[in-house]
């Protein structure tokens, strides 16, 4: 294994298992910061060594700037692992403001999604991240999720993004393992899987960890999986991946990850309410049952 490959495997600047944390809300729809602190402590105790707040699973499209800032502060108060804040938008100026304010609140890094809906050119993508980079003081994680953004980012564009001072990592939710290999080799950026079902395959091509939905209730076995992989015990890693497969399907299969993550946490008694803000709707009885069945099949209940 080359020195570069070892760097990809060993350099996990924000942790290995990072739940994309839901934002607990009270029955009136206001953010429940006390419940968020309880959840953050639970996740770390269960094995998470980094947390992502204000991401898609955290209902970032419907939470406001002051709530995002306060959530970062609240979580930072109670955990001693890296706290990454989502700070992405399809409006570059708004993205810059979010980056500045969440950094000031104490975020250890920012997760910046590709500018969705607007469908900019490759030059526009680079311009977006360059503007963010110029205002950043903390590391930037590029979030590539074409299913939500409608963008296909070329390998050459990744080369240009990697030249920016604060761009240090990628959350890859493209599902394209072959392209990920080339992008990693060319950029040297730390790579995080953005897909629970592809965690082990992404590890096999050099990813350092995952930003995950199922880690809300499965951080411990996911840590066991990555540790088994690190020591070369692929049989155990594969067994754990197969064990978690029903949970992956239960929480991700219908595409309502934020809803199902809250369902799983409610079943486990970790959050008091599954309230969500429209256009998302909290889980119904069928979804709660599905979350419970997925956890039970994965040996987590």
Swiss-Prot record:
Q: Write out the GO biological process terms.
A: diaminopimelate biosynthetic process; lysine biosynthetic process via diaminopimelate
Which Pfam families has this protein been placed in? DHDPS
Question: Any idea which GO molecular function terms this record carries?
Answer: 4-hydroxy-tetrahydrodipicolinate synthase activity
Entry superkingdom: Bacteria
Q: Write down the CDD domains for this protein, in alphabetical order.
A: DHDPS (cd00950)
**Annotated pyruvate binding sites:** 57, 211
The answer, when asked if Ligase is one of the entry's keywords, is no
The catalytic activity of this protein is classed by the Enzyme Commission as: 4.3.3.7
Any single GO CC term annotated in Swiss-Prot or TrEMBL for this entry: cytosol
Q: SUPFAM superfamilies from the entry?
A: Aldolase (SSF51569)
Q: Where is the active site?
A: 143 (proton donor/acceptor), 171 (schiff-base intermediate with substrate)
Main localization, broad class: cytoplasm
Site, as annotated: Part of a proton relay during catalysis: 56, 117
Entry keywords, A to Z: Amino-acid biosynthesis, Cytoplasm, Diaminopimelate biosynthesis, Lyase, Lysine biosynthesis, Schiff base
Q: In which pathway does it act?
A: Amino-acid biosynthesis; L-lysine biosynthesis via DAP pathway; (S)-tetrahydrodipicolinate from L-aspartate: step 3/4
Q: Which reaction does it catalyse?
A: L-aspartate 4-semialdehyde + pyruvate = (2S,4S)-4-hydroxy-2,3,4,5-tetrahydrodipicolinate + H2O + H(+)
Assembly, in brief, is: Homotetramer; dimer of dimers.
Report the function annotation for this chain: Catalyzes the condensation of (S)-aspartate-beta-semialdehyde [(S)-ASA] and pyruvate to 4-hydroxy-tetrahydrodipicolinate (HTPA).
Similarity section: Belongs to the DapA family.
Q: Which NCBIfam families match?
A: dapA
Q: What is this protein called?
A: 4-hydroxy-tetrahydrodipicolinate synthase
Question: What species was this sequence derived from?
Answer: Bifidobacterium longum (strain NCC 2705)
Q: What is the lineage of its organism?
A: Bacteria, Bacillati, Actinomycetota, Actinomycetes, Bifidobacteriales
């Amino acid at each position: 294994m080359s020195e570069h490959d070892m760097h990809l495997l060993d350099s996990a600047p924000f942790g290995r298992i990072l739940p994309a944390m839901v934002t607990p809300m009270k029955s009136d729809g206001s953010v429940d910061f006390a419940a968020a602190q309880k959840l953050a402590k639970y996740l770390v105790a269960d094995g998470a060594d980094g947390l992502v707040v204000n991401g898609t699973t955290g209902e970032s499209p419907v939470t406001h700037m002051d709530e995002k800032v306060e959530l970062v502060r609240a979580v930072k108060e109670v955990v001693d692992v890296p706290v990454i804040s989502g700070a992405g938008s399809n409006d570059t100026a708004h993205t810059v403001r979010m980056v500045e304010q969440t950094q000031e609140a104490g975020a250890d890094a920012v997760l910046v999604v590709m500018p969705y809906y607007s469908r900019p050119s490759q030059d526009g993508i680079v311009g977006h991240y360059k503007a963010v980079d110029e205002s950043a003081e903390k590391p930037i994680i590029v979030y590539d999720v074409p299913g939500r953004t409608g963008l296909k980012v070329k390998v050459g564009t990744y080369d240009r993004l990697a030249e920016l001072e604060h761009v240090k990592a990628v959350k890859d939710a493209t599902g394209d393992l072959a392209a990920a290999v080339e992008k990693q080799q060319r950029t040297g950026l730390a790579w995080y899987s953005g897909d629970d079902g592809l965690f082990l395959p992404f590890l096999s091509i050099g990813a350092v960890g995952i930003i995950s939905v199922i880690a809300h209730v499965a951080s411990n076995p996911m840590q066991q999986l990555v540790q088994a992989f690190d020591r070369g015990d692929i049989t155990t890693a594969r067994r754990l991946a197969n064990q978690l497969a029903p949970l992956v399907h239960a929480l991700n299969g219908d595409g309502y990850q934020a809803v199902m993550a809250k369902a799983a946490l409610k079943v486990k008694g970790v959050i008091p309410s599954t309230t969500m803000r429209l256009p998302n709707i909290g889980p119904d009885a069928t979804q709660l049952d599905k979350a419970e069945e997925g956890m039970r099949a994965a040996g987590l209940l």
